[in-house]
Amino acid sequence: MKKKNIYIIMEMVRRELHGNLLLTLISLKKSFNVYISDSSTFKHLLKKNLINPGIIHTKSITHGEAKSKFHQNLHEKKYLITAIDEEHGLLDDFDYEEYFITNRVSKKELDKTSAFFCWGKYDYKILRKYFTKSKNKFYLTGSPRSDIWKKKINFEKNKDEEQIFKKPYILICTNFSFSN
């Protein structure tokens, strides 16, 4: 049996690498070929017909006309498009529809998508309710990126970790983007 291909599009390495590596490990165990790169590389390879159809996994589905054309090209060439929005939808005291759905998910792009993975029940329930005709495209999976944060996935114990967290500490957020 021929192995199927998964192409993972990564935009921000610092944010997405670890979660995508976890996704890669799981996919490799299930006998997929996995390729990770940025969208411009995949666009070039697609244009030159240097990659075979498979699953394209991206970090968002709605991101301007260039991404829409790329998705259309993939869709026409029989690629399956899947996505998880890396910027999730939990926004304190903001209207979810106005600030997340309108900017991050569109019916036009969702029609080209085979699966949209949700971080949690909040996203999952609202998106299924909002996009009733496409509700079966939404999957409650969690985020590979946030799975890395959990203690149960402890690839290698840091010897100093216990000492560090015994003392009080201050966490300073250095990324003040709106929904990240």
Regions found by a protein language model. Name each.
Residues 4-160, 172-179:
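Active-site and donor-binding regions of nucleotide-sugar-utilizing enzymes
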